[in-house]
Amino acid sequence: MDLSRINTWKSKQLKSFLSSKDTFKADVHGHSALYYAIADNNVRLVCTLLNAGALKNLLENEFPLHQAATLEDTKIVKILLFSGMDDSQFDDKGNTALYYAVDSGNMQTVKLFVKKNWRLMFYGKTGWKTSFYHAVMLNDVSIVSYFLSEIPSTFDLAILLSCIHTTIKNGHVDMMILLLDYMTSTNTNNSLLFIPDIKLAIDNKDIEMLQALFKYDINIYSVNLENVLLDDAEITKMIIEKHVEYKSDSYTKDLDIVKNNKLDEIISKNKELRLMYVNCVKKN
C-alpha cells in the first residue's frame, strides 16, 4: 500500500479507505495517512483522519505535532493542540515540537507554543536539546528576543552563561549583545558581570566581540594581562582602558574587585604597561 498520493484521492476512494482495516497502518514507506496529510498541509484531511481516530492509533515513529511545527501555517498545530496532543512530548530524538518550530524559524508557531506554556522553551532531554539553546545556536536573534520577553522571572544563570559561551565561541555579536542586555537588566548583585568566556574572545582575537563586551560592566580581572601583552597589545590597551574607567567611575571604583585586583601590580612592574596606563588616564 502506498499512501503518498492520498491528498489527491477522490472522496469515494478516501471513504473506502477510512472504512477499511488499513486506515491507520503504515504504508510501504513506513508512514501513515496522517503523516502525508500534515506534510501536504491538508487541513481538511487532517481533520477527517482525527475524527476517524488517528491520534489513538499513531505509529511509534510518528509525532504529528512535531511534524506540523515545521509548517509555516499554524492551523494544523492549533488543531492538534485542541485535539489534546501533549506539547511537552519528546520525540525519538529527544526534542519537543517547539524545538522544530524554532529550527524552521516559524515565529507564529513559536508564539503559539510559548503563549500556552512559556516553560516549553527550556524543555529538553538535556540542556543542549532545549528550544532556547537551539535558537541561540542558530543565531536567531528574533526568536531569542521573543523568548526573553516571555520569561516572567529570571532563569538559571548557568543556562545563560552557557548560551553566552556558545555565542562568543561562534562570534555572534548581536546575539551576545541581546543576552548581555538581559543579563544586565536582571543583575541584582551590584557587581560587575562575570563572563567566564571573555578569555575565549581574547584567545580568538575577536576585536568586534571584545568591543561589544567592553560596553558592559564586565569583570575583566580574571585575565592574565602579562600573557595578553606578549600576544596582542591592542587587546591589552582595551583592558587597561576598561580598568581606568572602573577606577574613575564613582560607583565601580568602590567595588572590592576593582580596589583589590592584580592589574595595578602587573602594570607597575612593566614599563610598556605603565605608559599605556598613563596615556589612558590622561584621555579619561
Swiss-Prot record:
SUPFAM superfamilies documented for this protein: Ankyrin repeat
InterPro entries in the record: Ankyrin_rpt, Ankyrin_rpt-contain_sf
Domain of life: Viruses
Subcellular localization, as worded in the UniProt entry: Host cytoplasm; Host nucleus
Keyword presence, Repressor: no
A single GO BP: symbiont-mediated suppression of host NF-kappaB cascade
Gene3D superfamilies assigned to the protein according to its UniProt record, in alphabetical order: Ankyrin repeat-containing domain (1.25.40.20)
UniProtKB keywords: ANK repeat, Early protein, Host cytoplasm, Host nucleus, Host-virus interaction, Inhibition of host innate immune response by virus, Inhibition of host NF-kappa-B by virus, Repeat, Viral immunoevasion
ANK repeats, residue ranges: 29-58, 60-89, 93-122, 127-157, 159-188, 193-222
GO cellular component terms attached to this protein's record: host cell cytoplasm; host cell nucleus
Predominant localisation class: host cell
SMART domains referenced in this protein's UniProt entry, alphabetically: ANK
Upregulating conditions: Expressed in the early phase of the viral replicative cycle.
General function of this protein: Inhibits antiviral activity induced by type I interferons. Does not block signal transduction of IFN, but is important to counter the host antiviral state induced by a pre-treatment with IFN.
Recorded family membership: Belongs to the orthopoxvirus OPG039 family.
Protein name: Interferon antagonist OPG040
UniProt lineage: Viruses, Varidnaviria, Bamfordvirae, Nucleocytoviricota, Pokkesviricetes
Gene (UniProt): OPG039
